[in-house]
């Protein structure tokens, strides 16, 4: 009995002693949340943007994957593209409800272009990245692509969007990537990009 008590006492003292000598250090993490207030689906009288279930499509906020190279320059790339369709419709278009496709109408052509230069947010000094004319952005640039083609600003330089052979739909995939120098990005900063795209649809 005495032997057991002695061992217990020694262990207890060792525990207390260890607690007294331990140094407390702090580590901080920064968490970011971002969202966009949903807007009404964009529709015309004869066509609409829809998802794969024919539900009216409104773009939300996609995530960026950001990596650092050995010089601490960054590459930002969308985790997944925006994926949707343009289809001829008849009747009313209701948010959250499948559209009625107009099977008697054909899509003759679809052109797309950037309404303005993409806005870059979160960079040092409010730096704005230059729009890339290539699919892959160089340092200091942002590239917005549609079905693998780089989008340009203005209706004078549209991207021709492929239409299905039966002319009943046009599939669209919009992606982005950007590169920036280490000096233009603060550690822990939250960055994002906004790009308005206009579609000219001939039904």
Swiss-Prot record:
Keyword Signal included in the entry's annotation: yes
Annotated GO CC locations: pilus
Region forming the signal peptide: 1-22
Chief subcellular location: other
Protein keywords: Fimbrium, Plasmid, Signal
Protein localization: Fimbrium
Record's function text: Major subunit of fimbriae. Fimbriae (also called pili), are polar filaments radiating from the surface of the bacterium to a length of 0.5-1.5 micrometers and numbering 100-300 per cell. They enable bacteria to colonize the epithelium of specific host organs.
Protein name per UniProt: CS5 fimbrial subunit
